[in-house]
Swiss-Prot record:
Protein name, UniProt field: Miraculin
Organism expressing this protein natively: Synsepalum dulcificum
SMART domains assigned to the protein according to its UniProt record, in alphabetical order: STI (SM00452)
Annotated glycosylation sites: N71, N215
One Pfam family linked to the record: Kunitz_legume
Signal peptide limits: 1-29
Species classification: Eukaryota, Viridiplantae, Streptophyta, Embryophyta, Tracheophyta
């Protein structure tokens, strides 16, 4: 009886190993992070345009850029900001995972974020997000554009963000904590909203994350 049981167990484990070997893609899919979903429950697709819509009402609208400082000085590259009006979705965004073959955007994975169909200023043609250096005047790390798409490594470390689930199904936050360079020391943190003296709602590292949903853009 014991011999029969041992034979049955051996057959089970061998069958399981053969099944896993025959289905490597299925095994990889099972271990992959969850896909990011839009407000319709559909998976976010790489390179597709989406609006970021804040979860909290009466706390601003979508995301865009501002090329002026609080004192009116022009800056380039511009800063990433949230619009003040809730009804204003403003500029669409596209997301590009570290793995260029990945066609689905997933949580907890390094990715580039860039504004679509937008020319920031004549000194830079890049609309890719990046985390700027520490701003001593405000004590903040601000999000700007002018980053580098792809080419993960030390030279592009400031251009990689992550999407994480936050406070319920369909709600998300942005995080800066890239893992594309194992030897690099980075300042990790959630991306939140910093309101300057002119009332501009600027994206910056914060202990209060900016919670939002994704809404697929529609062109007429």
């Amino acid at each position: 009886m014991k011999e029969l049981t041992m034979l049955s167990l051996s057959f089970f484990f061998v069958s399981a190993l053969l099944a896993a070997a025959a289905n490597p893609l299925l095994s990889a899919a099972d271990s992959a992070p969850n896909p990011v979903l839009d407000i319709d429950g559909e998976k976010l697709r790489t390179g597709t345009n989406y609006y970021i819509v804040p979860v909290l009402r009466d706390h601003g609208g979508g995301l865009t850029v501002s090329a002026t400082t609080p004192n009116g000085t022009f800056v380039c590259p511009p800063r990433v900001v949230q619009t003040r009006k809730e009804v204003d979705h403003d500029r669409p965004l596209a997301f590009f995972p570290e793995n260029p073959k990945e066609d689905v955007v997933r949580v907890s994975t390094d990715l580039n974020i860039n504004f679509s169909a937008f020319m920031p200023c004549r000194w830079t043609s890049s609309t890719v997000w990046r985390l700027d250096k520490y701003d001593e005047s405000t004590g903040q790390y601000f999000v700007t554009i002018g980053g580098v798409k792809g080419n993960p490594g030390p030279e592009t470390i400031s251009s990689w963000f992550k999407i994480e689930e936050f406070c319920g199904s369909g709600f998300y936050k942005l995080v800066f904590c890239p893992t594309v360079c194992g030897s690099c020391k980075v300042k990790c943190g959630d991306v939140g909203i910093y309101i300057d003296q002119k009332g501009r709602r600027r994206l910056a590292l914060s202990d209060k994350p900016f919670a939002f949903e994704f809404n697929k853009t529609v062109y007429f």
